[in-house]
């Protein structure tokens, strides 16, 4: 069993090697969908549906992906992503590329597989759609949910009608009946109604069984002819309804292990006329059992208890079954492989038949009137082949009525349950079988075994050598028909060697091939059956026509129409002219299609001798035109072309000949009765002169070898002849080429001389042109040089003008500034003069006021002046020392900061330079010597570590030096403060302290923070109060006082804050450097 993973592919092959499904499982391929990104998660398929042809189907998973699988082309394609899980799918619309999908949001969408686009979106359901049924024409669809069913027009995608029911009842399923305009609705109370799809008028209602056989219907299936309905539910019983009589005609009981039916599907078969006999029953255990509803035999089953089936879909052609498994995968089964064992003659299966025919009482109770119900029990054991878990073999047991059957009835009973006598009576009454059931009747009459395995083995042998060039002898327009004819003839030739030598076999088989071109197995078996029964003794005189058979025809014609036979003899027309063309073509040349089908309805329904009677009947029915023929070509033309003939009269004449011909000349005496082909393997066909066929085969092989040798010699001769002709042509071409070369050489010499003369003239003209160009170039260069000099001169003039303008502007600006300053100076002088005059006035007033006190205060003023001068100069010296020290400290701090920054920059540059140099070296060394890389790296690391140690040592020294300088600065500052305090204390001792003075030394008191300084300032104030300065105008509180402090304390605070900021800035720079270049060493680097 092959397994295909779709993965994330949007298209690809379904299987990668030729499928070889086993007869035990029948699985062609198992399809899974695993997400490549999440291998543990896989998409689960939910539903699948085939198209109307049965060779393609679509399947949707729970992620909303819809795939198209083409089994003929072995290809799958992702056609749509709906992003929602699907609840139902339909793919049999009238537009082959469109499909319907019901989604989890209660909507139904129509998509196109070719364009991969949304065609329409249909809404209207309030609950999930459980099924979609499409009309046989593909133009209407019925969607069913639990509460409503809606009819849609697929041309306009508009809703036409809507079926509503009571919530207590509920809808189970609504679907179209095939081959009709009837809609069947099934409800949860087991009631079934039929509606006319055009008018939606109720046509009929199936009666509800009331004898305790309620099944609570859940699953339904309808045959292709729409005449039989199968229903099942929560029981192991199946109800089969005949929709023509509206009666329940059979109840099938499944094995006890089947407790409920989940799904029912009829399996279509070829030439069953739509009345399928195989019903697939999916039960609750996940196994789908296919049973024959007529014989109640278990045909085959699919699925297992380990991995059961959720839902299945059967292709309309009956070749494939697609099943969605419990694990979310998709299995594709081959019906041919599953039913291959059925072609072998198996032992009988267990069948328990219980016929209860209570026409009156049962019919009145159950509402099924005038019909008999047959209850059949299906056994679970089988003996034809081992099936999975079925290990019990139950012996066959038949329960039949006690009435006996005669041998005649046994002969007239066909395998499909048809009566040959009734068919013959029908044929005599109507003259032909119904066209609808003709293939099914022929298949039953011929009792075809359908040996799939044997036929496949014949096809596997390929095209027979005799029929490889069939298209040349029979140019058929239809390539398909030609291919089927070629395969059928090749299979016949592989079956028996005589058919490879029979020239008229294509003519004999062609009408059957054209009739059964869609089923090659049936075509082959029909032709083989015709050959083995209706072509008896044809090949005994091979390769001559069957003289014995033609003799029978001639004897019959002599008995029934001697005049016509004498006419043939008079003109030399033998039976090979008037009988053999009809037999070798089986009347296909002289009859139309309808006439031929009517004829063979009678041929297949009678003894093989009827075909010879039909030949004689055709000749006798055409005696009038034949008696008027007097040339042999006319006779040959007559029996190879269509003629005006009443086929009904001909067939009646054939029956008359069958009844009135004497026994001694009747073909029945020499021809055997009908014998069908054997099942399993085809019978041996050796009724021909084998030595002639072998001799012809040998002769043909010899002729073929001679033809091959002749062709080889002819090819060799042609090759030698072609070589000689080629050499002769080459010699002639060489001589012609030599002559042409001589003429061309002379012509080229003349042309060369002419060209040389032209070249000389051109060179002279070129030299002249060059001289002219050179002169022009010199003139242009001179003009350009002059133009450039002028340009430079202009530029310089412009620059000079610009400089002159700038000078003038600056001069005018300077003059304006000078005038402004002069005006400002004059105004300032005026202000100073005014202030001086104001002060002089003030001084004059004050001097006049204090003139009387000048003498008394001169001494005090002198002493106070000396004291102030002494203190002022002392304080001035101290402040200058402080300023010098402050400048020194600021300079030192700035120098240290610059030193650190410079060292850091130098180190960074050195590191970068070293890194660049070492990196360049490494690149060179890596390209040259790979083995020395690691050693160089270690050396480099050592060097870097040494540099790191050295640098960090320098940093430590710098930091130590900085701390030393800070300590020295702090010591100097403390020493300076102490010196000032001592000096102030020494100066404050001889001064008398007075508490009544003014606040002359208020700033000096702020500097002195201890008690000594307070005493000193108080004594100074008292002393000043006693000795009033001459310039002091007023001693009141509002007068202005002169301070000698000049903000020394504030300067000290600024100094400390500045040093602190410098320290913090240095720390920040160091931190940033460490972050940018951590630890100032490099780790070992791996070069690649």
Swiss-Prot record:
Could you tell me which Gene3D superfamilies the record lists for this protein? Ypt/Rab-GAP domain of gyp1p, domain 3 (1.10.472.80), YVTN repeat-like/Quinoprotein amine dehydrogenase (2.130.10.10)
- Positions the record marks as coiled coil are 736-903, 1048-1076
Cellular-component GO terms for this entry: centriolar satellite; centrosome; ciliary basal body; cytoplasm
Q: Name one GO molecular function term.
A: molecular adaptor activity
Keyword Zinc-finger tagged: no
Q: Where in the cell is it found?
A: Cytoplasm, Cytoskeleton, Microtubule organizing center, Centrosome; Cytoplasm, Cytoskeleton, Microtubule organizing center, Centrosome, Centriolar satellite; Cytoplasm, Cytoskeleton, Cilium basal body
Q: Which Pfam families match?
A: RabGAP-TBC (PF00566), WD40 (PF00400)
Q: From the record, give the cysteines joined by S-S bonds.
A: none
Membrane spanning stretches: none
The superkingdom of the source organism is: Eukaryota
Where is it chiefly localized?
cytoplasm
**A GO term (biological process) for this protein?**
cilium assembly
Spell out the residue ranges making up region: Disordered.
Answer: 1-20, 356-381
Q: Where is the composition biased (Polar residues)?
A: 363-372
* Ranges occupied by WD repeats: 33-74, 75-116, 117-157, 158-200, 201-248, 249-296, 297-334
Listed A to Z, the keywords are: Cell projection, Cilium biogenesis/degradation, Coiled coil, Cytoplasm, Cytoskeleton, Repeat, WD repeat
Give start and end of each Rab-GAP TBC domain: 432-607
Q: What does this protein do?
A: Molecular adapter which is involved in cilium biogenesis. Part of a functional complex including OFD1 a centriolar protein involved in cilium assembly. Could regulate the cAMP-dependent phosphorylation of OFD1, and its subsequent ubiquitination by PJA2 which ultimately leads to its proteasomal degradation.
What is the official name of this protein in its record? Answer: TBC1 domain family member 31
């Amino acid at each position: 069993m092959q397994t295909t993973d779709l993965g994330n592919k949007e298209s690809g092959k379904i299987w990668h090697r030729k499928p070889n499904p086993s007869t035990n499982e029948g699985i062609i391929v198992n399809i899974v969908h695993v997400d490549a990104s999440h291998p543990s998660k896989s998409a689960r398929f939910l539903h699948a549906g085939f198209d109307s042809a049965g060779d393609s189907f679509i399947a949707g998973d729970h992620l909303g992906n819809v795939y198209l699988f083409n089994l003929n082309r072995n290809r799958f394609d992702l056609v749509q992503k709906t992003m929602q899980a699907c609840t139902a799918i339909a793919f049999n619309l009238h537009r082959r590329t469109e499909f319907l999908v019901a989604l989890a949001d209660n909507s139904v969408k129509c998509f196109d597989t070719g364009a991969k686009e949304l065609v329409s979106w249909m809404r209207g359901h309030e609950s999930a759609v459980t099924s979609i049924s499409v009309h046989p024409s593909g133009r209407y669809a019925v969607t069913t949910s639990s509460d409503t069913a809606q009819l849609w027009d697929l041309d306009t995608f508009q809703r036409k009608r809507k079926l509503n029911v009571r919530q207590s009842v509920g809808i189970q399923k609504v679907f179209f009946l095939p081959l009709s305009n009837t809609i069947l609705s099934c409800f949860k109370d087991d009631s079934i109604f039929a509606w006319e799809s055009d008018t939606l008028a109720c046509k009929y209602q199936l009666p509800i069984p009331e004898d305790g056989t309620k099944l609570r219907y859940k699953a339904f299936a309808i045959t292709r002819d729409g005449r039989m309905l199968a229903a099942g539910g929560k029981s192991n019983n199946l109800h089969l309804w005949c929709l023509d009589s509206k009666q329940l005609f059979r109840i099938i009981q499944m094995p006890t292990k089947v407790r409920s039916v989940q799904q029912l599907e009829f399996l279509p078969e070829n030439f069953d006329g739509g009345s399928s006999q195989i019903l697939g029953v999916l039960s609750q255990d996940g196994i789908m059992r296919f049973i024959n509803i007529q014989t109640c035999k278990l045909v085959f089953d699919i699925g297992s208890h380990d991995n059961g089936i959720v839902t299945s879909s059967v292709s309309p052609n009956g070749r494939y079954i697609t099943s969605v498994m419990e694990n979310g995968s998709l299995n594709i089964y081959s019906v041919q492989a599953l039913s291959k064992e059925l072609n072998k003659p198996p032992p009988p299966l267990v069948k328990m038949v219980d016929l209860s025919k209570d026409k009156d009482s049962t019919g009145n109770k159950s509402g099924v009137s005038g019909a008999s119900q047959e209850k059949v029990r299906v056994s679970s054991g089988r003996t034809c082949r081992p099936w999975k878990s079925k290990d019990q073999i139950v012996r066959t047991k038949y329960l039949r009525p006690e009435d006996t059957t005669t041998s005649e009835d046994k002969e007239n009973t066909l395998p499909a349950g048809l009566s040959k006598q009734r068919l013959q009576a029908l044929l005599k009454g109507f003259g032909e079988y119904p066209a609808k059931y003709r293939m099914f009747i022929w298949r039953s009459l011929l009792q075809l075994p359908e040996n799939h395995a044997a036929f496949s083995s014949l096809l596997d042998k390929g095209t027979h050598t005799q029929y490889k060039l069939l298209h040349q002898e029979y140019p058929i327009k239809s390539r398909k028909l030609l291919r089927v004819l070629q395969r059928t003839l090749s299979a016949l030739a592989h079956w028996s060697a005589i058919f490879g030598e029979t020239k008229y076999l294509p003519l004999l088989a062609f009408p059957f091939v054209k009739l059964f071109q869609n089923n090659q197995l049936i075509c082959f078996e029909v032709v083989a059956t015709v050959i083995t029964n209706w072509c008896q003794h044809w090949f005994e005189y091979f390769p001559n026509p069957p003289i014995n058979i033609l003799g029978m025809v001639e004897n019959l014609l002599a008995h029934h129409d001697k005049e016509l036979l004498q006419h043939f003899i008079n003109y030399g027309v033998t039976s090979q002219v008037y009988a053999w063309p009809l037999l070798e073509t089986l009347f296909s040349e002289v009859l139309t299609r309808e006439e031929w089908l009517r004829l063979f309805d009678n041929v297949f329904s009678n003894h093989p001798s009827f075909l010879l009677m039909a030949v004689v009947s055709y000749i006798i029915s055409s005696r009038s035109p034949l008696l008027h023929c007097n040339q042999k070509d006319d006779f040959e033309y007559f029996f190879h072309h269509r003629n005006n003939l009443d086929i009904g009269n001909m067939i009646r004449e054939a029956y008359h000949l069958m009844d009135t011909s004497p026994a001694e000349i009747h073909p029945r005496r020499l021809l055997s009765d009908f014998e069908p082909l054997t099942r399993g393997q085809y019978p041996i066909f050796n009724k021909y002169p084998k030595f002639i066929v072998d001799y012809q085969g040998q002769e043909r092989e010899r002729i073929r070898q001679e033809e091959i040798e002749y062709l080889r010699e002819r090819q060799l001769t042609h090759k030698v002849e072609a070589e000689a002709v080629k050499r002769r042509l080459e010699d002639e071409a060489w001589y012609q080429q030599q002559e042409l070369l001589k003429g061309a050489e002379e012509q080229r010499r003349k042309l060369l001389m002419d060209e040389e003369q032209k070249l000389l003239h051109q060179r002279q003209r070129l030299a002249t042109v060059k001289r002219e160009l050179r002169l022009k170039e010199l003139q242009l260069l001179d003009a350009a040089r002059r133009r450039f000099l002028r340009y430079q001169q202009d530029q310089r003039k412009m620059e000079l003008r610009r400089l002159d303008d700038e000078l003038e502007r600056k001069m005018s600006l300077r003059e304006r500034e000078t005038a402004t300053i002069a005006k400002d100076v004059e105004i300032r002088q005026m202000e100073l003069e005014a202030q001086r005059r104001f002060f002089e006035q003030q001084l004059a007033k004050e001097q006049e006021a204090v003139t009387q006190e000048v003498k008394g205060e001169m001494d005090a003023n002198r002493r106070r002046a000396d004291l102030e001068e002494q203190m002022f100069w002392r304080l001035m010296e101290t402040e200058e020392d402080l300023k010098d020290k402050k400048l020194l400290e600021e300079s030192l701090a700035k120098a240290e900061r610059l030193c650190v920054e410079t060292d850091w920059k130098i180190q960074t540059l050195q590191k970068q330079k070293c890194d660049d140099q070492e990196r360049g070296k490494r690149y060179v060394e890596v390209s040259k010597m790979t083995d020395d890389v690691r050693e160089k790296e270690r050396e480099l690391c050592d060097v870097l570590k040494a540099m790191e140690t050295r640098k960090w040592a320098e940093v430590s020294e710098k930091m130590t030096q900085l701390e030393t300088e800070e300590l020295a600065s702090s010591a100097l500052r403390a020493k300076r403060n102490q010196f000032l305090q001592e000096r102030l204390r020494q100066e404050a001792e001889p001064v008398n302290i007075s508490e009544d003075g003014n606040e002359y030394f208020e700033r000096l008191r702020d500097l002195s923070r201890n008690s000594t300084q307070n005493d000193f300032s108080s004594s100074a104030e008292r002393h000043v109060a006693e000795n009033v300065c001459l310039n002091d105008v007023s001693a009141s509180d509002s007068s202005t006082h002169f301070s000698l402090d000049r903000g020394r304390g504030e300067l000290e605070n600024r100094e400390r804050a500045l040093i602190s900021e410098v320290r913090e800035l240095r720390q920040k720079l160091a931190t940033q450097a460490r972050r940018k270049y951590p630890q100032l060493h490099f780790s070992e680097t791996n070069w690649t």
